[in-house]
């Protein structure tokens, strides 16, 4: 006669199930995660996962929630380690990279757009909001002190999009190594910092008048007949590593 599992055993099984789901997602996307496949890999009955999760979306949402909580905790700890706003921003940024490269499978799953809507899972929405607040809090302080110009919330998304794009390029193996990742990252941060310190430009119109759009289309059509040769960017020279001071 089968005995009832203890809560500790149940928690351990759920943790193993989530770990397998995270790995399978990283290897083959959502299609490679099914209740049957998970049960088969864990060596249990196909119905066992249903005792603890409604379906695979429920499992993936649980994995994402835990990942966002770990991500937020990592950023919070980094931000609390320094007091000066600019150094805090630097520390949070370094913690972001450290998490992404230490847990690439979790990072990909956190931001995969094919996952269930966060509002279907309150805990997932809470964890995601916690991470976003942590990324934007130091920018609000910097804006209040006049260190940067612009809406802190908008700027946080601009920075997030930039760092996320760079991280995903590296995880996908799209950065050749010359220039070095750190050279690209440093240059990106320099440009972002310079932009945030610059005075805000005049607001762009919400929508271009229809006549302007038509004129733009005509100009585009004329430009096609006389193609302009592309301007190739100058190669970035890799910085020499300085000896430790």
Where is each model-derived feature located?
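N-terminal intrinsically disordered/low-complexity leader segments
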Residues: 1-12, 23, 200-214, 218-245
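Helix-turn-helix
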Residues: 16, 20, 24-58, 62
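Conserved hydrophobic residue
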Residues: 30, 148, 175-176
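Amphipathic alpha-helical linker/stalk segments
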Residues: 65-90, 120-135, 139-141
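Amphipathic C-terminal alpha-helical segment
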Residues: 109, 141, 161-178, 192-202
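Amphipathic alpha-helical packing segments from all-alpha helical-bundle domains
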Residues: 119-145, 153-158, 182-194
